[in-house]
Amino acid sequence: MPELVVTALLAPSRLSLKLLRAFMWSLVFSVALVAAAVYGCIALTHVLCRPRRGCCGRRRSASPACLSDPSLGEHGFLNLKSSGLRLHYVSAGRGNGPLMLFLHGFPENWFSWRYQLREFQSRFHVVAVDLRGYGPSDAPRDVDCYTIDLLLVDIKDVILGLGYSKCILVAHDWGALLAWHFSIYYPSLVERMVVVSGAPMSVYQDYSLHHISQFFRSHYMFLFQLPWLPEKLLSMSDFQILKTTLTHRKTGIPCLTPSELEAFLYNFSQPGGLTGPLNYYRNLFRNFPLEPQELTTPTLLLWGEKDTYLELGLVEAIGSRFVPGRLEAHILPGIGHWIPQSNPQEMHQYMWAFLQDLLD
C-alpha cells in the first residue's frame, strides 16, 4: 500500500517532466527544421557562386605541414583503459612541471592550442588531445558512443594513462562544456581549470529558457540534431560553411593562414570525418532538464565581449553557481569566440597570473 501511495503522489511530477521533455524536443526539432532551411539556402548559394567546387567536399590526400611542426611537441597515441579507443595527442615539456591538458572545441582539433603548447611547455607538461571522433583519434560511428558520460571517462583515462593523478584543465568551446562537467564528477583529478568561451550545460539550458536570443545564437546546434543532412550541408562547396566560420572577417579567427585553415579541414574532409564531431551535438539535449550543480574547482574564465555564439549574460549565470572565491572571470573587450587563437597573448597573461602560485 505505501508503494501505491508514493506512486500516486509522484505521478503528477512525472507527468509534468514528460510534458516538459516533449515540449523541449518539439521545440528543438522545430528550430532544427528552420535552421536546415536557412543553412540549405546558404550552402546552395555557395555552390552557385563557386560551381567548380561542386556539391561535395574535396578529400585532402595529405595533411598540411603545420600539423607536423616539431616546435609544438611530439605526436603520440594513448589506448584508453575503459573504452579501448585510441586517442591522438601532441605532448611537450614532459618532466617540466604539472600536467596541463588541453581540450579543443568544434570545428577544431589539437592544433587550436598551438600557441599555448609553445608558451607553457617550459614550465608544464603540455598535452593537447584530439577528442574521440576528431583527427587521427578513433571515431565510432554510433551516436550513443558520444554521450557526455563516455567523453568524461575518456578525459579521466587520458590523465591516468599519462601517469598523473591530477591536471590543470584548459578548455574551449565544446572542450569547455566537458571540462565543467569533468570538474563536477571527477573533482580530485582537476587542480585548476582555465575555461574559454563555454558554459556548463545546465547553466546554458536554464539561461536559454529565459533568454530566447541565446537560442538564435545557437541555431547551428539545432541543425546538428538532424541525421546526415548537417554533414552534407557543411561539406558542400568544399566545406565553405566551415571555412566561413573560421575565417569570417568579423566573427572568425583573424590572420588564420591557408595552411592553418587546412589543418582543421584535413580530417573533416576524410570519409565520415564530420559525423563523430556532430554526434557530440546529437547527444546534447538527451538529459534535459539538468539539475543545477555547485561549482567548486578554482577556475579562470575568459570570455570574449564580441562572442558571436554565446551571450555575455552567461558569465554572470556561471558565477552564480560557484562557491565564493573560486571563480576568476574576465571579459575581454572587442574580442570574439576564438580567444586561444585570436588573442593568445592576452590569454597567456591571465593564465600565468592565475597559475603563478603553483610554480613558486
Swiss-Prot record:
Inhibited by 1-(1-acetylpiperidin-4-yl)-3-(4-(trifl uoromethoxy)phenyl)urea (TPAU), 1-cyclohexyl-3-dodecylurea (CDU), 12-(3-adamantan-1-yl-ureido)-dodecanoic acid (AUDA), 1-((3S, 5S, 7S)-adamantan-1-yl)-3-(5-(2-(2-ethoxyethoxy) ethoxy)pentyl)urea (AEPU) and to a lesser extent by 8-(3-((3S, 5S, 7S)-adamantan-1-yl)ureido) octanoic acid (AUOA). SUPFAM superfamilies: alpha/beta-Hydrolases (SSF53474). Keywords: Endoplasmic reticulum, Hydrolase, Lipid metabolism, Membrane, Microsome, Transmembrane, Transmembrane helix. GO terms for biological process: epoxide metabolic process; lipid metabolic process. One of its GO terms (molecular function) is hydrolase activity. Changing residue 173 to A: Loss of catalytic activity. Gene3D superfamilies: alpha/beta hydrolase. It is found in: Microsome membrane. It is a single-pass membrane protein. InterPro entries: AB_hydrolase_1 (IPR000073), AB_hydrolase_fold (IPR029058), Epox_hydrolase-like (IPR000639). It catalyses: an epoxide + H2O = an ethanediol; 9,10-epoxyoctadecanoate + H2O = 9,10-dihydroxyoctadecanoate; 9,10-epoxy-(12Z)-octadecenoate + H2O = 9,10-dihydroxy-(12Z)-octadecenoate; 8,9-epoxy-(5Z,11Z,14Z)-eicosatrienoate + H2O = 8,9-dihydroxy-(5Z,11Z,14Z)-eicosatrienoate. The active site is at residues 173, 281, 337. GO terms for cellular component: endoplasmic reticulum; intracellular membrane-bounded organelle; membrane. It comes from the Eukaryota. Its EC number is 3.3.2.10. The keyword Membrane applies. PANTHER family: EPOXIDE HYDROLASE. Catalyzes the hydrolysis of epoxide-containing fatty acids. Active in vitro against epoxyeicosatrienoic acids (EETs) including 8,9-EET, 9,10-EET, 11,12-EET and 14,15-EET and leukotoxin. This is Epoxide hydrolase 3. It comes from Homo sapiens (Human). The gene is EPHX3.
